[in-house]
Amino acid sequence: MITKPDKNKTRQKRHIRVRNKISGTAERPRLNVFRSNKNIYAQVIDDVAGVTLVSASTLDSEVAGDNKTDQAKGVGELIAKRAIEKKITNVVFDRGGYLYHGRVQALAEAAREAGLKF
């Protein structure tokens, strides 16, 4: 019997491979994205200290949108605004093993337009 590979397990393996190569520092922290079926979460993380500096998600009341892609754009704008308030402008983008398409791409482009550099 042929079994289909679990999409989330392959994503996690891909994420581990990427995480072995990139790391966030205090000068250039990591912008991490996690996508669930209903929500999308973004965090700016300093991996050296092991601290989350800024976070935003669709669970925040400031994020509104008709569909998930619009909500992801709102999260991107919000994470960029909060990061710039803490004087963080340069980040390393960590797509979390997801394809750079759809909600992940919308979040990244909105964060870039709002002032984050990556």
From Swiss-Prot:
InterPro entries: Ribosomal_uL18_bac-type, Ribosomal_uL18_bac/euk. It holds the Pfam family Ribosomal_L18p. The keyword Hydrolase does not apply. GO terms for molecular function: 5S rRNA binding; structural constituent of ribosome. GO terms for biological process: translation. GO terms for cellular component: cytosolic large ribosomal subunit. Keywords: Ribonucleoprotein, Ribosomal protein, RNA-binding, rRNA-binding. The keyword RNA-binding applies. Part of the 50S ribosomal subunit; part of the 5S rRNA/L5/L18/L25 subcomplex. Contacts the 5S and 23S rRNAs. NCBIfam families: L18_bact (TIGR00060). HAMAP family: Ribosomal_uL18_B. This is one of the proteins that bind and probably mediate the attachment of the 5S RNA into the large ribosomal subunit, where it forms part of the central protuberance. Belongs to the universal ribosomal protein uL18 family. This is Large ribosomal subunit protein uL18. It comes from Levilactobacillus brevis (strain ATCC 367 / BCRC 12310 / CIP 105137 / JCM 1170 / LMG 11437 / NCIMB 947 / NCTC 947). The gene is rplR.
